[in-house]
């Protein structure tokens, strides 16, 4: 087995078939200004203690937040095994990086706060990695977020796309 195939096998194997984690209900602070949440967290964003400048909506449904100055960015994504989310990684990670640099809080969410939003958060954290071992960093971030939130990027296709871009292509 070649190195790339081995890495992909080990990463997918170590993050699959784990105990069934329950869906997270609370918003998680990922970096100083980037938060991960679900649809309910987004609806509650205007009254949150965090003064969000942006909400990144990754659900299929477009909405507004009445009486709010929060800017909503909508990227409609389907949570299935055929959706190519990797084509959004560069734009989303660049946007989240700017939010962090400018101290502009942003909430990234999908319906449950698990797959679509989790994948974008994982991609963002992987894009910031300057370590020499992207495979170990992937496992560290994945398991740390899973410990914090419960379910996190359970969609095997989304995991595979992140692994291919940020782990396999880096080796």
UniProtKB/Swiss-Prot annotation:
Q: Which Pfam families match?
A: DSPc
Q: Say which domain of life the source belongs to.
A: Viruses
Catalytic function, reaction form: O-phospho-L-tyrosyl-[protein] + H2O = L-tyrosyl-[protein] + phosphate; O-phospho-L-seryl-[protein] + H2O = L-seryl-[protein] + phosphate
Q: Name one GO molecular function term.
A: phosphoprotein phosphatase activity
According to the UniProt record, one GO cellular component term is: virion component
Keywords recorded for this protein, A-Z: Host cytoplasm, Host-virus interaction, Hydrolase, Inhibition of host innate immune response by virus, Inhibition of host interferon signaling pathway by virus, Inhibition of host STAT1 by virus, Interferon antiviral system evasion, Late protein, Protein phosphatase, Viral immunoevasion, Virion
Residue ranges the record marks as coiled coil: none
EC numbers: 3.1.3.-, 3.1.3.48
Q: One GO BP annotation here? A: symbiont-mediated suppression of host JAK-STAT cascade via inhibition of STAT1 activity
Q: Give the protein's function.
A: Serine/tyrosine phosphatase which down-regulates cellular antiviral response by dephosphorylating activated host STAT1 and blocking interferon (IFN)-stimulated innate immune responses. Dephosphorylates the OPG144 protein.
Q: What is this protein called?
A: Dual specificity protein phosphatase OPG106
Gene source species: Monkeypox virus
Gene for this chain:
OPG106
């Amino acid at each position: 087995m070649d190195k790339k195939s081995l890495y992909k096998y080990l990463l997918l194997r170590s993050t699959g078939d784990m105990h069934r984690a329950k869906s997270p209900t609370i918003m998680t602070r990922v970096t100083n200004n980037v938060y991960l949440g679900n649809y309910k967290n987004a609806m509650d964003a205007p009254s949150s203690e965090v003064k969000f400048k942006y909400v990144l909506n990754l659900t299929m449904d477009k909405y507004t937040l009445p009486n709010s100055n929060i800017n909503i960015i909508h990227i409609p994504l389907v949570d299935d095994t055929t959706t190519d989310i990797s084509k959004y990684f560069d734009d989303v990670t660049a946007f989240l990086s700017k939010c962090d640099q400018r101290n502009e809080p942003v909430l990234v969410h999908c319906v449950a706060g698990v797959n679509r939003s989790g994948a974008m958060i994982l991609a963002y954290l992987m894009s910031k990695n300057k370590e020499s071992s992207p495979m170990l960093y992937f496992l560290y971030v994945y398991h740390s977020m899973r410990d914090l939130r419960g379910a996190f990027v359970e969609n095997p296709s989304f995991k595979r796309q992140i692994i291919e871009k940020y782990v396999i292509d880096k080796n």
